[in-house]
Amino acid sequence: MSEPPVIGVLPLTPARFPDLATLFEEGGDPKWCWCTYFRSRGRDWSNSTAAGNRAELKALAKRDLAPGLVAYRDDRAVGWVSLAPREDYERLATSKILAPLDDVPVWSIVCFVVSRRSRRQGVAATLLDAAIEYAREHGATTLEAYPVEVPKGERIPAANAYHGTLTMFERAGFTVVERRQWNATSPVHPIVRLDL
């Protein structure tokens, strides 16, 4: 039986950080990463710890511009999306696949986390809609993301879908602006944009 729909999506603040911590501590990559991977460069990331990553995200929650949005159902955090102006994500500047396409000032969506009990219930799509509105309200003119393309009829592990799926972004009005890959044998990664 599925859970009721998400009832609210709110910016991360220090007061909401314990709710997000409960979600992230369910396990998997969020428990270690704390959604800081794209905010650091290689060497800094290699030297990071789960406690340090948690402290970094907690500090980011104190900013006027939230580092992401939290989805709630019945006062429980069930989802997260990380979004910010692209320059906040240091790793994007040095990535071969995700390097800037041009000089357009974009905001980037880099990560989704959805509670195990709430997956396949529209939580990520609800977060995406809220992210579009949040970016628009804060002056963004273009939103960019780096989703995974799932072949029709196939499923992928949740751990591989943390960027969101291409179909979800296309349903929200995003279009593929480029496809990149490391080399001829690596997977192709779409880059999508939405003009706000």
Label each residue range with its predicted role.
Residues 1-39:
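Conserved N-terminal entry element of GNAT/NAT acetyltransferase domains
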Residues 29-55:
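Conserved GNAT-fold acetyl-CoA-binding loop/helix
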Residues 45, 50-70, 87-91, 108, ...:
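A short helix-loop-beta-strand connector motif used in the catalytic cores of GNAT acetyltransferases and
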Residues 63, 72, 76-113, 117-119, ...:
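Conserved acyl-donor/pantetheine-binding loop and adjacent beta-alpha core of acyl/acetyltransferases
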Residues 70-72, 82, 191-195:
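Short, well-ordered beta-strand micro-motif
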Residues 109-114, 120-137:
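Conserved acetyl-CoA-binding loop-helix of GNAT-fold acetyltransferases
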Residues 128, 135-160:
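Conserved GNAT acetyl-CoA-binding A-motif
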Residues 160-172, 178-196:
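C-terminal "cap" of GNAT-fold acetyltransferases
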